[in-house]
Amino acid sequence: MTIYSNSPITIAILKLFQELENYILKNHKNLPHGAVKAFIFGGCAFHIHTNARGSNDIDAEIQAIQQLKKHDIVVFLENNDVEYLDDNNLETNLEFDRSFNTSLASVDPDYPERAIPLVANRIVEVYLVSGLDLAISKLARLSDRDIEDIKELYLNGKFSLEAFKKSANNAEMYYATPEQLHSNIQYLVSILSELRG
């Protein structure tokens, strides 16, 4: 499965999480690999999957062992933007979006099992959510851009229609307002069915 792990945005994301690991190692010893796990969602994940538009905000689910304070990790990420040169050689900033929360998104709880490791066997491990889980996470809001993103992921072979239905139904069971999500799922299933006709 093709991902774009050497693009300027991807390199900037990995730099931010390397800086987080350096910060953690200054204050803690003998931590296991995966003491912090970051799961990349949103526009950055869409970019890594498709090399299409990116985002200046990192949407990520952060998990941390009890020994570490998740709040301190989030504050560090929020206060440490990464400057980088984009594809047009323009200087831009990448910022961590503290407001992203998987409990507010439509997410299949099995997403970590399908995540693609970008950085493994380190204190801070970074994962890219699968194209399937990225598509599912866009179902709750379902803006015009979300619809286009889901279609592009599907047309790029990132998931099958059957996998989409199954995972969307899993997400629906855990979502706060399942009726609205159900309606969005049905709408997208009809759109995706027509695409592959």
Where does each model-flagged region fall?
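Compositionally biased terminal segments of proteins
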Residues: 1-40, 44-197
